[in-house]
């Protein structure tokens, strides 16, 4: 399968992959929706697959990007794609790819997740301004991801969590989250969420 960013750059897909990449139409709509938030932001991509959403975010000014997937082939592909796109920016974006079970990694918390070595010199470990989660639609992981983000201090104050899910089966959300926007794109829906309380308190 051939993947292209909205700007036309070609990306790689894992060979023989049955992954479900976010459609170009959805990617473009999400990036437009976040246009004011992306420049200079920190972006966490959960169940990143080929890394295409994180690549789109980098093209639009994200400065610190972490992409996580438990599949070895997916993580390797994301690493190559993100290095290509990040290296084309001036200065290059700070990119880290993690191959690990999503929930196990999130539940460590941001202070114990092993990202310190990837920080720029003089920077302190912090959460993320924007988090995008796109697990397999039928996985049932959405509530657990939300809870792990809250419990682990992953979201900065004023930050947003975006969930990509099936339009026909939107997930039930745990307490502590409210829907800011909901956009349907055919069989896919994107929910933009924020905590009902400041996540840093």
Name each model-derived stretch.
Residues 1-201:
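Class I S-adenosyl-L-methionine-dependent methyltransferase catalytic core
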């Amino acid at each position: 399968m051939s993947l292209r960013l909205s700007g036309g750059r070609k990306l790689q897909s894992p060979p023989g992959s049955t992954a479900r990449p976010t459609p170009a139409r959805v990617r473009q709509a999400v990036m437009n929706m976040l246009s004011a938030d992306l420049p200079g932001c920190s972006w966490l991509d959960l169940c990143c697959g080929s890394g295409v959403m994180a690549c789109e975010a980098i093209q639009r000014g994200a400065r610190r990007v972490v992409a996580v997937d438990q599949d070895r082939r997916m993580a390797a592909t994301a690493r190559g794609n993100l290095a290509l796109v990040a290296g084309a920016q001036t200065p290059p974006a700070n990119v880290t790819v993690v191959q690990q079970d999503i929930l196990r990694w999130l539940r460590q918390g941001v202070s114990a997740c092993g990202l310190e070595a990837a920080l720029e010199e003089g920077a302190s470990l912090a959460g993320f301004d924007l988090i995008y989660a796109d697990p397999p639609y039928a996985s049932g992981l959405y509530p657990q991801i939300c809870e792990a983000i809250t419990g682990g201090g992953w979201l900065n104050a004023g930050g947003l969590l975006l969930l990509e899910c099936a339009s026909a089966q939107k997930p039930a959300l745990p307490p502590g989250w409210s829907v800011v926007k909901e956009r349907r794109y055919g069989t896919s829906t994107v929910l933009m969420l924020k905590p009902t309380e400041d996540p840093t308190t």
